[in-house]
């Protein structure tokens, strides 16, 4: 969006959400608002229903693990001790505006947020994806189950502390004639052999 359109949207947001605790930043032609998890549903409904905003479409939703970050936005808000966040990308078809919402989850051990399916139905599979990959639980989701990994998958593969090789591996067992799961058997190995050259190797004789 152009700066004038972003400024207009920012003004509308400040007026409509004046009674809410909202941190706003403008970077790369887009607005981002940082809100508290307890205010998520109220603000989401306002963003959708208020005629000056009319964010009727949820374009994307994703989880983020900030455990290895020092800041949480391009503008440099301090991350504090909250590890997980959920980011929402909204579109207003009526006004042709876009908005990003970032919400940090309070509990690092059992991350949980309210589902926004009843506000934006397109959140359904996005919330399932964040649950599957990050382990973020969405309250009142009608069908919260894994969507990308298998049902017996252990852990959440997009968390920063998830091992690169995983925990289990899958292979076909010719004796049982079916696919089986077993603990990973990957071992550290040296792909390029270590070669010790003899002294004076490559030096021209005189």
Curated annotation (Swiss-Prot):
UniProt entry keywords in alphabetical sequence: Cell inner membrane, Cell membrane, Membrane, NAD, Quinone, Translocase, Transport, Ubiquinone
Protein EC: 7.1.1.-
Compartment(s) of residence: Cell inner membrane
GO molecular function: NADH dehydrogenase (ubiquinone) activity; NADH:ubiquinone reductase (non-electrogenic) activity; quinone binding
Annotated membrane topology: Peripheral membrane protein
One cellular component (GO) term of this entry: plasma membrane
Principal location: membrane
Summary of subunit composition and partner proteins: NDH-1 is composed of 14 different subunits. Subunits NuoB, C, D, E, F, and G constitute the peripheral sector of the complex.
HAMAP family: NDH1_NuoC (MF_01357)
Protein name per Swiss-Prot or TrEMBL: NADH-quinone oxidoreductase subunit C
Organism: Nitrosomonas eutropha (strain DSM 101675 / C91 / Nm57)
């Amino acid at each position: 969006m152009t700066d004038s359109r972003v400024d207009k949207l920012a003004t509308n947001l400040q007026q409509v959400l004046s009674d809410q605790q909202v941190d706003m930043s403008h970077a790369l032609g887009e607005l981002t608002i940082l809100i508290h998890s307890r205010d998520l549903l109220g603000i989401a409904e306002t963003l959708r229903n208020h005629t000056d905003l009319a964010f009727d479409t949820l374009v994307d939703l994703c989880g983020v693990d900030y455990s290895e970050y020092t800041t949480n936005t391009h503008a440099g808000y301090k991350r504090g001790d909250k590890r997980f966040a959920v980011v929402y990308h909204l579109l207003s078809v009526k006004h042709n505006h876009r908005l990003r919402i970032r919400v940090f989850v309070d509990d690092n051990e059992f991350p949980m947020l309210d589902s926004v399916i009843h506000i934006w139905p397109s959140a359904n599979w996005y919330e399932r994806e964040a649950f599957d990959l990050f382990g973020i639980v969405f309250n009142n989701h009608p069908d919260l189950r894994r969507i990308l990994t298998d049902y017996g998958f252990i852990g959440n593969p997009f968390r920063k502390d998830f091992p690169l090789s995983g925990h289990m591996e899958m292979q076909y067992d010719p004796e049982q004639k079916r696919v089986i799961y077993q603990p990973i058997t990957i071992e550290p190995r040296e792909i390029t052999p270590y070669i010790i050259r003899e002294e004076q190797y490559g030096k021209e004789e005189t």
